[in-house]
Design a protein with these regions (language model features):
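Acidic, glycine-rich A-domain
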Residues: 1-226
């Protein structure tokens, strides 16, 4: 599986990156290796079109309903990482299930500089960590469906992504909290850990996006041996 960073900072090298991806995909096609290629992005037109149909009051109501749903979930289940951001999308560019005509057509479109000007396909932010979590949750399905013994996971990106949000907001990963002790406010240090229920390994997590990237990559490696 390959992930491609579809962010604005990649604009100068995106065409060359796509060409590299096409070469890798062609190799996989020749030797019949199952593969999928995704672009991760904060931009996609379907959601924007949906938003454009709503007036400001409707958008606010929808946001409040979603916020309340997560608050109720947090009350039931405690603090957890929330990766269901409206600003995270995965676009499947290539796969081993494509026909030769489909593959060649997509290749021509992607290397055309005008492709990025299509509505919904402009580059945006870098939801790197969210895309890694998606891989962590779904890589096993890909391995099982294709009866794969050894998997290679490639990420083509130029920088760090945004930090995770949690059911408690960004404060859910703060390294300290305020409590009243003997009638006085005191700052209490705290640490956060995430546990893989399959490997039973535990990882320390902070608000630092780079640390988060490293943690999820280690979780992917430990669970799937990639």
């Amino acid at each position: 599986i390959m992930l491609v960073d579809w962010s604005g900072s990649m604009n100068d090298v995106l065409t060359d990156t796509i060409k590299q991806v096409i070469n890798l995909a062609q190799f996989c096609n020749r030797v019949q290796i199952p593969y999928r290629v995704f672009a991760f992005t904060t931009q996609y037109s379907d959601l924007e079109n949906e938003r454009s149909l709503l007036n400001p009051e409707q958008r606010m109501k929808k946001w409040q309903e979603k916020k309340r749903w997560y608050e109720m979930k947090a009350e039931r289940e405690g603090n957890y990482i929330n990766c269901s951001s409206d600003k995270f999308h995965l676009l499947e560019l290539f796969s081993s299930k494509m026909s030769l005509v489909e593959f060649n057509t997509m290749s021509k479109r992607l290397v055309d500089p005008r492709f990025l000007w299509n509505k919904g396909y402009t580059t945006g932010g870098t939801p790197l960590n969210e895309s890694l979590v998606w891989i962590y949750e779904h890589l096993g399905e890909f391995i099982k469906a294709n009866n794969i013994e050894k998997t290679t996971f490639i990420t083509l990106t130029d920088g760090e992504g945004s930090s995770f949000n949690t059911s408690l907001g960004h404060r859910g990963l703060e390294d300290s909290r305020n409590e009243i002790v003997d009638g006085q406010y005191k700052r209490i240090k705290q640490k956060h850990f995430i546990k893989d229920e399959v490997t039973q390994k535990t990882y320390e997590l902070t608000r630092d996006s780079t640390v988060q990237t490293d943690v999820v990559l280690r979780m992917i490696k430990d669970r799937y041996n990639v």
